[in-house]
Amino acid sequence: MIDVKDLIEQPEKYRASQEARGEDASLVDRVVEADAARRSSIAGFEQLRAEQKAFGKRVAQAKGEEKQALLAEVKDLAARVKEAESAAGAAEARLAELQRAFPNLIVDGVPAGGEDDFVVLKEVGTPRDFAAEGFEPRDHLELGELLGAIDMERGAKVSGARFSFLTGVGARLELALMQLGLDLALENGFVPVIPPTLVRPETMQGTGFDVEHDDEIYRLERDDLYLVGTSEVALAGFHAGEIMDVSAPVRYAGWSTCYRREAGSAGKDTRGIIRVHQFNKLEMFIYAAQEDAEAEHARLLAWEERMLGAIEVPYRVIDIAAGDLGLSAARKFDCEAWVPTQGTYRELTSTSNCTTFQARRLNIRERVRTEDGSKGGTRMVATLNGTLATTRWIVAILENHQNADGSVTVPAALRPYLGGMERFELV
């Protein structure tokens, strides 16, 4: 949620952000107008309440016919107070509605444009030349079936399309990835968390998801709970309504199953486990002071790159364009791994700086210290998130490390988590 006071003081900054996102810049003016209407209606209500209190004293002192006349006026004034209170409430609600609809203010340097307007920041590693090696690469599903690692057919039988079983070395590989990521997180001061995967609507909305109109979210109607698409949601709600100490960043690593309906993905990635309804993910989540947010964002990206380096796959880092950031992010970097059979890069990780957007929605603050060290007021913290490992990484590992016979060489960094196994053999 945006800072309305800041928008009123610097409207052009918010107009520029909206334009970079390809969104309606006139929303800025509507917020300004709604805030003015709110202030005016509250002032009108408070003035009438003051008159009502003063009038009450006159009535108490009056007698006889004068008192009867004043009582009639009191009734009329009470009706006007009630009407003014209702108007003030409606004005507050209108401003809150606009405030919730307003995307986060992008940070300086974010490229303008939509999904295809990202900027490639770096490419690391060189894709293998399978033709020079003398064989045609198999895709991850064919490899997974040869290795007894992925079973889409039984996944569909049990649960429907876009579900799978990870079996044998497939299950072990995912667990190894998660443990490698968790060890990296522990090394860097993260607290491991296994969070709930069902959350209340206010928690989902607090992180920037629209529970009323987002077709990607699974809902349990009977209980009014939502299945999370990332542990970011539960971790963001962890400190909702609290005043935190973020003199040093507070870092959590959440390991959870995630669920996405993939409602807008008909016909896309129908083969294999690139786009599924259920997957596991290790997510980094950070609460930080506002001035530390950009540095923490850079660290999140660096940790993601360390993981990608550890699994030895070619990858690139892209700076996501403003129009593809989503509601909460002020800046987002994606790391995409090379997928040989598709001849392109596919997203494996994403890291977002949400500045104070989520904290404002969830009312998460820090205590401000004055120069002499005494307690001052409070202000919003910044929140950030980033992926350390997820089921989709299996795609990149299998395809990039395959051998001509269908076996797969295990990246050295994962071998300690697989009992020293150096190769996945055909079953």
From Swiss-Prot:
SUPFAM superfamilies: Class II aaRS and biotin synthetases, tRNA-binding arm. Pfam families: Seryl_tRNA_N, tRNA-synt_2b. CDD domains: SerRS_core (cd00770). The keyword Kinase does not apply. Homodimer. The tRNA molecule binds across the dimer. Consists of two distinct domains, a catalytic core and a N-terminal extension that is involved in tRNA binding. GO terms for biological process: selenocysteine biosynthetic process; seryl-tRNA aminoacylation. This is Serine--tRNA ligase.
